[in-house]
Swiss-Prot record:
UniProt-recorded Gene Ontology molecular function terms: peptidyl-tRNA hydrolase activity; tRNA binding
Active site location: H19 (proton acceptor)
Complex and partners: Monomer.
Gene Ontology process terms (BP): protein quality control for misfolded or incompletely synthesized proteins; rescue of stalled ribosome
Keywords assigned: Cytoplasm, Hydrolase, RNA-binding, tRNA-binding
Location of the protein in the cell: Cytoplasm
Encoding gene per record: pth
Reactions catalysed, as given in the entry: an N-acyl-L-alpha-aminoacyl-tRNA + H2O = an N-acyl-L-amino acid + a tRNA + H(+)
Protein name: Peptidyl-tRNA hydrolase
C-alpha cells in the first residue's frame, strides 16, 4: 500500500489557501479516483482506495501544519510501512512560482514546518515529496499572512493546472517512475 499525504490546516477558514495546497491535491485525487477521505483516524482524515491498480491511503492530517508529523508517524506505524519507500508528501513551496511543481526523492525540510515535523516524528528525510509552488511572499508581508492567504484568480488558474500535474506525478511515483516524473515536471 502507498500512503499519499497532503499537508494543510484543518479549519474551514484555511480551505484553498496557499498552505493548504496539499489538501487540494488530495481532494482532487479523491474526486478522480472516487475515494472518500472522511475516516477520522490517526489524527487525520483518511480514505483508502485503488489508483491505477495500486492500493492507496490518502491522508489529510488534522493536527495543524506544524504538528503534521504526529499524524503521519501514527499512520506509518499503524500500517507498518516504510516512509522512505511507501509514502509521498505533497505540500506548498514559496520558492516556486504558482503553477510549478518540484519532485524530490528525499531532502531536508527546507524551512517548511510541516516537513520538519514529519522528519522529526518519522526519523527520516528519505521520503518522496511533491512541492507545489505558491509564490514568494510580497516584500513587507508577514510569511504567515502570505501562506494563509488565498491565490489571486490568475494564480489560482495556474495552481489548478499544477494540482493536475501533482496528481499525475504521484501516480508515476507510485508506479516506480519517480525519475520519469522528475524529468517531466521538474
Amino acid at each position: 500500500m502507498y500512503v499519499i499525504v497532503g499537508l494543510g490546516n484543518p479549519d474551514k477558514k484555511y480551505e484553498h489557501t496557499r498552505h493548504n495546497i496539499g489538501f487540494d491535491v488530495i481532494d482532487a485525487l479523491a474526486d478522480k479516483y472516487n475515494i472518500s477521505v472522511t475516516d477520522k483516524k490517526h489524527k487525520a482524515l483518511c480514505g483508502s482506495g485503488v489508483i491505477e491498480g495500486m492500493k492507496v491511503l490518502l491522508v489529510k492530517p488534522q493536527t495543524y501544519m506544524n504538528l503534521s508529523g504526529e499524524s503521519v508517524a501514527e499512520v506509518m506505524n499503524f500500517y507498518k510501512l516504510d516512509p522512505d519507500e511507501e509514502m509521498i508528501v505533497i505540500f506548498d513551496d514559496i520558492s516556486l512560482e504558482p503553477g510549478r511543481i518540484r519532485i524530490r526523492k528525499k531532502g531536508s525540510a527546507g524551512g517548511h514546518n510541516g516537513i520538519k515535523s514529519i522528519i522529526a516524528m518519522t526519523g527520516t528525510q528519505g521520503f518522496s515529496r511533491i512541492k507545489v509552488g505558491v509564490g514568494e511572499k510580497p516584500q513587507g508581508w508577514d510569511l504567515a499572512d502570505h501562506v494563509l492567504g488565498r491565490f489571486s484568480s490568475e494564480d489560482r488558474a495556474k495552481v489548478e493546472e499544477a494540482i493536475g500535474h501533482a496528481m499525475d506525478a504521484a501516480v508515476l511515483m507510485m508506479q516506480g517512475e519517480t525519475d520519469k516524473a522528475m524529468n517531466i515536471y521538474n
